[in-house]
Amino acid sequence: WDLKHEKRGSVRASLFFIALAIATFYYQAIGQGYLLNPRNRYSSLWAQMIGVVVPLFLFVLANWCLTTLFDGEGSFKDVFIACSYSLAPIPLLVIPATIYSNFCVSAETDIIGFIGTLAFIWLGILVFFGTMVTHDYSLGKNFVTILGTLIAMVFIMFIAVLFTTLIGKIVSLITNIVTEIQYRM
């Protein structure tokens, strides 16, 4: 409500929440205890950035495209701010769980998994109600819109893969044509 009607949200703060979520997942990847990360698999900051930014951007884009067609009141910026602010539970719960993972025994690893699951459930609830308030939808219409957004995300990913493959084929064709012309000369 405050983000939409009282204009308390900003893009700068949204970018801060995104950076905080990326840093949290990076810390989780390198800071988990041995019980949860026995092979010392570390992830790069780049991988964590892609893992946060790409799904967020896909959701915001798909939601904005879909709600533009179905009388949504939110702009792209409003949807971005609402979804970015929804990332707040991630550092609040994942960082303490990661710290706790260094001291827990094997019987307590389920608690850490539960805390991580709780963070994502809280995130989902915030995204759901944030988009509902942003677009001024009823509960049922927002539920249908969220399902449509998820389908649109899959469709956008399919189009992106198709486009990337097509560009690769065109580059390969041009390379083959240039190679054949060089052989003929």
Question: What annotation goes with each model-predicted range?
Answer:
Residues 4-7, 77, 141, 169, ...:
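Context-gated lysine
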Residues 3-7, 84, 178, 182:
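Generic secondary-structure transition motif, activating predominantly at the C-termini of alpha-helices
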Residues 24-52, 96-120, 154-185:
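Membrane-helix interface segments in multi-pass membrane proteins
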Residues 1-77:
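Selected alpha-helical membrane-embedding segments in polytopic membrane proteins
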Residues 63-158:
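Hydrophobic alpha-helical transmembrane segments and adjacent short intramembrane/lumenal linkers
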